Amino acid sequence: MVSSCCGSVCSDQGCSQDLCQETCCRPSCCQTTCCRTTCYRPSCCVSSCCRPQCCQSVCCQPTCCRPTCCETTCCHPRCCISSCCRPSCCMSSCCKPQCCQSVCCQPTCCRPSCCRPCCCLRPVCGRVSCHTTCYRPTCVISTCPRPLCCASSCC
């Protein structure tokens, strides 16, 4: 019965909750009704199955990087899209320009593209937040005017 659920019937009509077994977790079976705890499998991670309850660590695939999937367990480098800019996603591999929010101003986020005024909040230069890659004109504000921050692009 479960095997037959993993065919066109499941793809067209979806599986009932009691039929969502591990053997039924195939891309064609990832309909709304199939997003249950037994269906959190990598093979189920398709765009049509990216529901909030399906955002487990095994489901962090490129096709599953959706705003509703932006949870702590889904903060993998491949999930760092603009809609995934959350505090829990602030890791070095996730430091993209669109992720440079004030909540993302961490030492690992000091990249040239991340040097925005909201990231220049520490007055003492030479500490972890004052990397050479962050010495940009946009970083020269009253709270970060020390000589150590005056790189050629900042003068």
UniProtKB/Swiss-Prot annotation:
Q: What InterPro entries does the record tag this protein with? A: KAP (IPR002494)
Q: Which GO terms describe its cellular component?
A: cytosol; keratin filament
Per-repeat ranges for sequence:
5-9, 24-28, 29-33, 34-38, 44-48, 49-53, 54-58, 59-63, 64-68, 69-73, 74-78, 79-83, 84-88, 89-93, 94-98, 99-103, 104-108, 109-113, 114-118, 119-123
**Pfam families per the UniProt record, alphabetical:** Keratin_B2_2
Residues annotated as region 20 X 5 AA repeats of C-C-[GIKRQVHEML]-[SPTRV]-[STVQRCP]?
5-123
Q: What is one Gene Ontology biological process annotated in the Swiss-Prot or TrEMBL record?
A: hair cycle
Name the tissues where it is expressed: Expressed in the hair follicles.
Q: What keyword terms does UniProt attach to this protein? A: Keratin, Repeat
Q: Which domain of life is it from?
A: Eukaryota
Residue ranges annotated as coiled coil are none
Q: What does this protein do?
A: In the hair cortex, hair keratin intermediate filaments are embedded in an interfilamentous matrix, consisting of hair keratin-associated proteins (KRTAP), which are essential for the formation of a rigid and resistant hair shaft through their extensive disulfide bond cross-linking with abundant cysteine residues of hair keratins. The matrix proteins include the high-sulfur and high-glycine-tyrosine keratins.
The family annotation for this protein states: Belongs to the KRTAP type 4 family.
Q: How does it assemble?
A: Interacts with hair keratins.
Q: Which PANTHER family match?
A: HCG2042992-RELATED, KERATIN ASSOCIATED PROTEIN
**Official protein name in the record:** Keratin-associated protein 4-7
Native organism is Homo sapiens (Human)
